[in-house]
Regions:
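Hydrolases whose catalytic domains are alpha/beta-hydrolase-1, hotdog thioesterase
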Residues: 17-21
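Flexible "cap/lid" loop of the alpha/beta hydrolase fold
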Residues: 38-54
Length: 133
C-alpha cells in the first residue's frame, strides 16, 4: 500500500466518518471527500491536527444532515489547514476552492441546490481530486 495515497470518502454517515478521519487520522490519510456529512455533536474535533486535503459537498436543501452542520465540519478542516476565508470558483460548478491553505492541502467545497444526496458530479469530481496525489 502506498501510504501517501490513502483516502476516505462517504455519504451521510460515511461522510461523518470521513470528517472524523480528517480530524483524528490526518497523519494516516492524505485526503477526504465527505458528502452530506457533519461531525457528531459529541465528537471533539479541535481542528488542530496535521493538515489533510478535502473535497466536500452538501445539498442546500438537505433535511437529514442540515447544511450548517456540514459547514461547521468543513470549518474545522479549514482551521486545521490554516485556510483563509476567500474562495475562487472551480469546476465543477458550484464548487469553490479556499485560498491560503497549507501548500498541498487544498479544501474544495461544493454546495449544490439539492436534498440529502450525492450530487451528479460527485463521483467524477472526487476521482479527479484524489488522482492529483
Amino acid at each position: 500500500v502506498d501510504n501517501t495515497r490513502i483516502f476516505s470518502t462517504g455519504f451521510s454517515y460515511g461522510g461523518m466518518m470521513s470528517f472524523a478521519v480528517g480530524c483524528e487520522l490526518s497523519d494516516v490519510f492524505r485526503a477526504i471527500a465527505p458528502m452530506a456529512g457533519s461531525l457528531y455533536s459529541d465528537f471533539n474535533c479541535r481542528g488542530t491536527g496535521p493538515a489533510i486535503a478535502m473535497w466536500g459537498a452538501h445539498g442546500t436543501s438537505d433535511t437529514v444532515v442540515p447544511p450548517e452542520d456540514g459547514r461547521a465540519a468543513r470549518d474545522k478542516i479549514l482551521q486545521q489547514n490554516h485556510c483563509g476565508t476567500e474562495t475562487v470558483p472551480v469546476e465543477p460548478s458550484p464548487c469553490v476552492k479556499y485560498q491560503g491553505c497549507d501548500p498541498g492541502y487544498d479544501v474544495t467545497w461544493c454546495e449544490w441546490d439539492g436534498p440529502h444526496g450525492i450530487p451528479n458530479f460527485g463521483s467524477a469530481a472526487i476521482a479527479e481530486f484524489f488522482l492529483q496525489f
